[in-house]
């Protein structure tokens, strides 16, 4: 068998000639005819243009009407999918481009006569034996460049699966059918016999890899020697297919053997068992489906095909334009003050769910479901088919009027953490050190708090009780005396970085990256209770009855302090929940997915009531007089109506768009912290009371900034603001005659 294989390998080169002859002398036997056809093909094939080469190659491949031959060439051309072959095919050969310009006139002359030669060879090839077809095709593929080989691989794959589907007339699953030629044959006319056997193992292609107990062509299959198996296939074909192939069919026309360009595109585009449904769908449906994917997955889809890449690019552009339009609409809504009375105040009845004894909500006896549009959805429709009761609450258009800004610090620090409790001091941390800033005098207090071995990640200032709490990367919480700066107590127990803290009376709650929420007694420093998540804690809040905590997974959990039990778990966010706020009736959660979600704190009611959309992640949130106040990573503070989700006001916290890390509300003032600055902003008259402008003694109150009140619509550069608009202030803030560059510091935001 090995000798037969070696002779077969050299069969195309058998010649009836002497060693010095360049042209065969005999054209009668099959070997000599094959040699002459190959010789004549070499004369013109490499000199014609690419289109003619492709038409001739595809015409030859279409005459391979044997499933066995198609599978053989498919195995040979598997290397065209390798990375080295793809790299070589994608390279630009400048020398070939220059050569094509020189040979263009010669190609025009060749094209007139070569088409007739191609038709003659195709007619001869169609009536040749399988042995001749196999060897001629092998030598023709040797003359092809990498791009033509890729076309050949795609065409053979398509033809193979088409022939396979035609043979499988019993509607068998083609993945469970194995094709092989029958070993019994007649001496005169051996024809291809095909049978199928069911397999339990899934195979991507028939005859790809047989199990160990099966034999192919009477010999054991060895996956380590694919080339020897291929030669064995050729030797078997020499024995089986020595006769002429009968391909004459009704309506057969030898003039149509040369394939046109449309057929080439259909065949060379590849074939798969699974259709590309995106390509067959209308464009608007394809884009609608791709729009559901996240950006990372959408980038991967662009590598599937050119059509998918075009669709993915259009979806990205649509999403970008949609986000820009939505952001502009929200900004215009927040900047449009007409119809929004900053002094508006009213008492309204708000629905809250009715609860039974076990804390579950009561449903109506005969529910009626109704589909509502986005504009029809509000707080009242959120309790659809739920029994509710009315609770009287007060609403006000807080922070919707004019405002002024006072910059307390203008240093860039992405690790800055601040806390403000409404007094005269603000606690500020930078790395491991903590200091206090007097917002009245706008100067630092000389007391410095040192002792943490790691950076400070959480602060809580209690100015009334004269102490400061700090949580650090060193896993400890420290209790500091404000006047002396001495650490009087250390809370130990966390096994991860302290990320958040909150205080209610003498109960401190802390969360860390150890996935634990701990409740402490501030007076004794003892840990009273521990609650657990499965992911690191990012935010926590406490009141007399409940503790609310959130984690990186996007879950919000409500715990009962006295009973030490989990009341409910709120899920709905697709990103980590970084901020929380709750009162007796409602709970707000802000996440990296750009949503603020409103929930009910009553009993075990777990449905989301409202969702407030932001262009980027939400870093802080609060609820005041039924107005949702949120800080976003795009550098803006937004005020939403809790009833219907409408944005009432958009405030630019800084001109550079730095993320707003946190804010603290006290009366009609907001302390804002972001990466580059933190400022004390005074909102003027949202509750109908104008701040006093009188200064007593040498200490000027913050309300003196009310004299820098702006009545312009929009934002004006500092150079266009009148210097006389700034009244004299003491306390080191501004001199009596403030220059223009000081105005820019005093009035960072100039909105209405």
Curated annotation (Swiss-Prot):
PROSITE patterns per the UniProt record, alphabetical: WD_REPEATS_1, WD_REPEATS_2, WD_REPEATS_REGION
Tissue specificity as recorded in UniProt: Expressed in pancreas, heart and skeletal muscle.
Keyword Ligase: no
Alphabetical list of SUPFAM superfamilies matching this protein: F-box domain, WD40 repeat-like
WD repeat residues: 169-206, 451-490, 493-532, 534-569, 572-609, 611-652
Signal sequence, renumbered to the chain: none
Sorted UniProt keywords: Repeat, WD repeat
InterPro entries found in the cross-reference section: F-box-like_dom_sf, G-protein_beta_WD-40_rep, SCF_subunit_WD-repeat, WD40/YVTN_repeat-like_dom_sf, WD40_repeat_CS, WD40_repeat_dom_sf, WD40_rpt
Pfam entry (one): WD40
Further details from the record: FBXW10B gene is located centromeric to and partially within proximal CMT1A-REP element. CMT1A-REP is a complex binary repeat element flanking a 1.5-Mb DNA region duplicated in Charcot-Marie-Tooth disease type I (CMT1A) or deleted in Hereditary neuropathy (HNPP).
PANTHER family hit by this protein: F-BOX AND WD REPEAT DOMAIN CONTAINING PROTEIN 10B-RELATED, UBIQUITIN LIGASE SPECIFICITY FACTOR/HREP PROTEIN
Name of the protein in its database record: F-box and WD repeat domain containing protein 10B
Gene name, Swiss-Prot/TrEMBL: FBXW10B
């Amino acid at each position: 068998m090995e000798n037969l294989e070696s002779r077969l390998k050299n069969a195309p080169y058998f010649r009836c000639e002497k060693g010095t002859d360049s042209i065969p002398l005999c054209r009668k036997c099959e070997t000599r005819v094959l040699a002459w056809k190959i010789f004549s093909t070499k004369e013109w094939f490499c000199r014609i243009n690419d289109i003619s080469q492709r038409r001739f190659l595809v015409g030859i491949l279409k005459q391979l009407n044997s499933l066995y031959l198609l599978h053989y060439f498919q195995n040979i051309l598997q290397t065209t999918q390798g990375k080295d072959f793809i790299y070589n095919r994608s390279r630009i050969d400048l020398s070939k481009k220059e050569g094509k310009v020189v040979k263009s006139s010669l190609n025009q002359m060749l094209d007139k006569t070569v088409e007739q030669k191609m038709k003659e060879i195709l007619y001869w090839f169609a009536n040749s034996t399988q042995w001749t077809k196999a060897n001629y095709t092998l030598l023709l593929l040797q003359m092809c460049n990498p791009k033509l080989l890729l076309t050949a691989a795609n065409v053979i794959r398509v033809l193979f699966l088409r022939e396979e589907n035609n043979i499988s007339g019993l509607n068998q699953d083609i993945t469970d059918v194995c094709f092989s030629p029958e070993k019994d044959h007649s001496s005169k006319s051996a024809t291809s016999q095909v049978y199928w056997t069911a397999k339990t193992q899934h195979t991507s292609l028939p005859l790809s890899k047989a199990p160990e107990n099966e034999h192919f062509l009477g010999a054991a299959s060895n996956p380590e020697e694919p080339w020897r198996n291929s030669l064995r296939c050729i030797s078997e074909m020499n024995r089986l297919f020595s006769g002429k192939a009968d391909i004459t069919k009704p309506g057969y026309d030898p003039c149509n053997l040369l394939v046109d360009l449309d057929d080439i595109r259909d065949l060379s585009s590849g074939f798969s068992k699974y259709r590309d449904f995106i390509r067959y769908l209308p464009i608007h449906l394809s884009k609608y489906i791709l729009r559901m994917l996240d950006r990372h997955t959408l980038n991967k889809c662009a590598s599937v095909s050119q059509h998918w890449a075009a669709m993915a690019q259009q979806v990205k552009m649509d999403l970008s334009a949609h986000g820009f339009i939505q952001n502009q609409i929200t900004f215009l809504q927040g900047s449009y003050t007409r119809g929004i009375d900053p002094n508006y105040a009213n008492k309204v009845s708000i629905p809250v769910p009715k609860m039974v004894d076990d804390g579950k909500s009561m449903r109506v006896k005969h529910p009626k479901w109704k589909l509502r549009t986005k504009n029809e959805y509000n707080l009242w429709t959120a309790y659809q088919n739920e029994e509710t009761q009315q609770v009287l609450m007060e609403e006000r258009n807080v922070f919707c009027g004019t405002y002024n800004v006072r910059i307390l610090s203008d240093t860039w620090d992405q690790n800055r953490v601040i806390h403000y409790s409404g007094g005269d001091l603000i606690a500020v941390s930078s790395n491991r050190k903590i200091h206090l800033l007097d917002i009245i005098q706008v100067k630092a207090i000389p007391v410095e708090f040192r002792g943490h071995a790691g950076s400070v990640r959480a602060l809580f200032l209690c100015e009334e009780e004269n102490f400061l709490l700090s949580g650090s990367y060193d896993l400890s919480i420290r209790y500091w005396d404000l006047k002396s700066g001495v650490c009087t107590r250390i809370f130990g127990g966390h096994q991860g970085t302290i990320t958040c803290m909150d205080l209610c009376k003498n109960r401190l709650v802390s969360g860390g990256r150890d996935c634990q929420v701990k409740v402490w007694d501030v007076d004794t420093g003892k840990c009273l209770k521990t609650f657990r998540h499965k992911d690191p804690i990012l935010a926590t809040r406490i009141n007399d009855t409940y503790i609310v905590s959130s984690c990186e997974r996007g879950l919000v959990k409500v715990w009962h302090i006295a009973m030490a039990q989990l009341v409910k778990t709120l899920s709905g966010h697709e990103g980590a929940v970084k901020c929380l706020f709750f009162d007796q009736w409602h709970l707000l959660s802000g996440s990296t997915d750009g949503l603020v979600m409103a929930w009910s704190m009553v009993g075990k009611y777990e449905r989301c009531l409202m969702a407030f959309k932001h262009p980027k992640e939400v870093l802080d949130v609060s609820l005041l007089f039924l107005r949702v106040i949120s800080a976003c990573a795009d550098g803006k503070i937004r005020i939403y109506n809790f009833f219907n989700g409408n944005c009432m006001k958009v405030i630019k916290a800084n001109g550079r768009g730095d993320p707003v890390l946190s804010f603290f509300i006290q009366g009609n003032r907001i302390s804002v912290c972001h990466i580059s600055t933190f400022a004390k902003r005074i909102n003027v008259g949202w509750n109908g009371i104008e701040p006093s402008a009188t200064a007593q003694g040498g200490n000027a109150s913050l309300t003196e900034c009310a004299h820098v009140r702006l009545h312009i619509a929009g934002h004006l550069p500092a150079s266009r603001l009148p210097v006389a608009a700034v009244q004299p202030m003491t306390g080191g803030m501004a001199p009596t005659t403030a220059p223009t560059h000081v105005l820019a510091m005093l009035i960072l935001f100039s909105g209405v």
